[in-house]
Amino acid sequence: MSSLLIEGGRPLSGRLNVEGNKNAALPLLAACLLTSEECVLENMPRIGDVAVMANLLREVGAEVDGVGTTTVRVRCRTITSSEPPAALVGKLRGSVLLLGPLLARTGRAILGMPGGDFPARRTIGTHVDALVALGARVLPSNGHALDTPDGMKAASFYLDEASVTGTETALLAAALIDGVTEIRHAATEPHVVEVCTFLQRMGVEVQGAGSSTLRVHGRKNLKGATHRLNGDYIEAGSWAVVAAVTGGEIEVRGARAEDVEGIAFVLKRMSVECTFEDGFLGIQKS
């Protein structure tokens, strides 16, 4: 589709439920590679990016069931390849999240240039620097190739930017390292907190979730886990804003109150009648 034709002038009204947060879905799928046991992810968004990530997991040895539904099951008994197909990697920016799990389980990761956003605008230097701090070595490559000739070791380091996927890459790599890894200048977004929660269910101790300093007590063997994704607060907020600017009334369910509070605060400051509580965001005519 090259263009969208939008006929405005009508209030947007109604009720809807948001699905799980896409920005949490991709790192959670990558985290499933950290264990040989089955992981179950519920309330998954039914979007193309999830299907692409599922195919990437299959290419490195995982069994993935339920794609296209809201419950996805992943089991990766053995990593069969440390180099997912470059063509598939090129379809998804989130493919960079495979670096940490592949290095942690196999000591090697080769990744073509991640797709999605224009590379000049978003690099993965922060991700690579974090992995190097944990013991990885950068190899000559047209994309990104790393190995760990002396193994991975716990470390304390400062991220040069509070990158979400950079923080998640560091978390996923540190999860399988014995000892305590300290990540400073970490991203604090709700989906980063959700990754911390999932890792804790797998047996990792994570301190400081939601703050800019994370302490990860890793372990060599992680267990499988079940996790229900939080609702996508960005989608919820988008619907709320559209309803507000068109003079409509809408009820959006599925997002947590603490995740939509900032959106509600701004709307109220603009004199929009807005109510929010856990699992509910409402916009009234104003």
What is each residue range found by the language model?
Residues M1-S286:
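Short, structured segments at the rim of ligand-binding sites
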